[in-house]
């Protein structure tokens, strides 16, 4: 470092000063080192959310860094930069920020000067000048107050505004500092590192202030000077105040705190005077006796002893005991839960009941979970029923308190869509152009914007404004927008959590989160436990309850795992897996008939193989070929007996991360810790490229062990192909058991499976409409929502013989297997806009049933608007009212009248208080009924929208999806349907799987990358699409490989064509509202006589119908 490098920047902000700072923390560190600064302090607005990233980068760069915070006050106090001198000072800063967070709504921090005075000990403080001219009197009072508390830990900051008044302002501030007896300290108050980032700073200011850049005026920075400046430039700017420069180095040297000092202390979980080690060993022994009732195998005992010894050396016993406590609580209140991820490699976790995968059955690798040579905490993920996980979360808060337990943060960052829209708005582009720009973007990626996307949005790619929008949208991507709560990562500490990291409120009541995300915690080696939510566990829990209540068959997950049936695997092999956990996507379905799973380990492979890692590593086709060869009786040849032991279970093809590690250990002489570093390098390969550092060691190590160099290089390239997508076998094994359990339930009880899936929404790949269609194809009778029969959840009704003829022909083999005897009654939860509390009141007061709309209104206590939603959902059929008649009756209720709420009139005679004359209402046409069903329920039991277009489609040569099975492979076909799902598996050569639906079922479309680029708008924007392509039939799985796509969404207007003569508008009752108005009477006469009334124009009608049809779900 040069001799003049004596300036430390202490006023820097990063993009974690949300929409103020305009550069990432890591780039600030790198630039500061390059600029020759003696040190860098980062002080973001009321937050330390970005300091761990800077800390990690500074360690890599070997550069001095200190964490702090810029305190912004709500009481008019000028901003103050606060830096901790030591560990105690850090705890005080965290307590200070926590106090401001907890008195505010999520995302805000309300600080007062009194908070700082309470927590200022061991903090160094720099009082900053505001944007205006200095106010000597108030500033002198503030400095006097602060000096009484902070003494010589207080400085007055000098930051140039570059507005022509700096010399004057500095003189005023210097005089105030001399009078107060405190030092001056120089800072450039940097918002970004490089002056070229000034335009991006203007963009984030525009977004923050909700005004376009052209109209932002003085809200924008006056110049591009707010960047990190080198020591020479700063010395020149402060040549009149050299002490202000010198004080930055003095200040920095007084800071003796490092984030590495934050040691994690897990709460002691002692029981009856036992040490944590004694408690853990006892619980493991008890669990092992239950897991192995015929005696614990010697191999298992050795593994348990090895794991317990390592856990003891690392002092992790309290962590395992805490996770065990959470699982024990969940099971005590009948919440289904199951551990997964790398923890499934552990026999200790298996014996504690945390996981349900016996590592001895799957040749798993404990070092993948915990290693004596690896200084990083273990990571245990536990899935709970997603509707009941909150009970576990509140148990944590009750047990440990918010001062000791908090959810991990998730950093919500700008992605392609949000960045494109916000930057386009900042540059003044219209909403239509904004929507066009982002509508063609797939998913929520972070790929830079291209000229092709601009052209697709109708923009001139050569226009300078367009180029700026694309450039700054690309720069803004990955910038943090705000902090949200992680899906379930919890930090639990023995000492106060708010002295380790600030805590804050979340958007949900009675929840608290910290400011750091999981990567920050990993960097600081702070332990967390993931309390995750899994919809399939909710589905299975509800399904098991229905099975016991209606069929008298109590069952558990463990019992299903032992009940291996051919019928279940037969259904899986046919890819009849809509709704089945993990294998319901089109990509998975296309694999199932080729893989032909016949046992649990086959499902482990199925879960893992349709992943980007095996695809990138060119492992899928070799594995399938070897499996087919095995079925023909051909033997697999292995390069050595040692590798056979590693790869035999996957027929010589490495599919899992654990196998990559075992190959490195067995064939290349890696130690377990080196193999784990290889695994970590695989996980970060795309971002860091560090996997190449292992290539020489692995290849040469294998050659030294007598493997051919070509084979060694091929092995390494396969492992490298995993990239960041390599799938752990332990994770796949945990999920495979749920695959089988859900498939078992669907095989034998499709009525229960459908009801449980509907009652666990939102979850899974398909919307309720497709789950209902699939259940009907399996012979399940579906009943509509009804005020006298429905509950919030879907119910099972009736009793009778199963109608085998109701099963769709393609599921004919299931007719002798299915045990269903019930119908499924749809629940109120499907009706848009209804609240569970309202529907509970309706059910509780229903008695023997409601006799009329008026009776429902009187007895339920529900508002007229709730009854309107029920009428819109056609839920009054049991009292003889169709949708239109029910809406008429609801509109007759006087919402403003209170007379019927008086106790005197709540008797039987109150129905006569308001009597409306009966009106001859025309029946609502079938197309209009379907429109309203989709608008209120997102599905219809009456008809499919495409059925109204079939006559037109047939004339155009458009086949039904049902016809594809009888069509020869290779033939050109045309199909059309509603777009249900678009799936783009990562790195699968850009292919998109589309699922479309007509009145006879679904058709599966393959869109290759070249075709997608040509028809991007049609793929991404169509609600109703026509596809021409070649039919492909592989092992009974049918696809249409698209060659041409057409957006035919406007044809949805056909659903309204038959309704026009009735003058029906968007609301079914809108043209029929009872009124004394003469114009209304004239309309009514027209309706009775069948006279034409004004209808919406063709395009408008189609747009209205399209709006209520499903958009299609996008998945990666």
Curated annotation (Swiss-Prot):
UniProt-listed InterPro entries: DNA_pol3_alpha_NTPase_dom, DNA_pol3_finger, DnaE2, DnaE2/DnaE/PolC, DNAPol_HHH, NA-bd_OB_tRNA, PHP_dom, Pol/His_phosphatase_N
UniProt entry keywords in alphabetical sequence: Cytoplasm, DNA damage, DNA repair, DNA replication, DNA-directed DNA polymerase, Nucleotidyltransferase, Transferase
Leading EC class: transferase
SUPFAM superfamilies in the record: PHP domain-like
Main location: cytoplasm
UniProt catalytic activity: DNA(n) + a 2'-deoxyribonucleoside 5'-triphosphate = DNA(n+1) + diphosphate
Signal peptide: none
One GO CC term, this protein: cytoplasm
Pfam families: DNA_pol3_alpha, DNA_pol3_finger, HHH_6, PHP, tRNA_anti-codon
Compartments (UniProt record): Cytoplasm
Function: DNA polymerase involved in damage-induced mutagenesis and translesion synthesis (TLS). It is not the major replicative DNA polymerase.
UniProt family annotation: Belongs to the DNA polymerase type-C family. DnaE2 subfamily.
Protein's name in the database: Error-prone DNA polymerase 1
Lineage: Bacteria, Pseudomonadati, Pseudomonadota, Alphaproteobacteria, Hyphomicrobiales
This protein's encoding gene: dnaE2-1
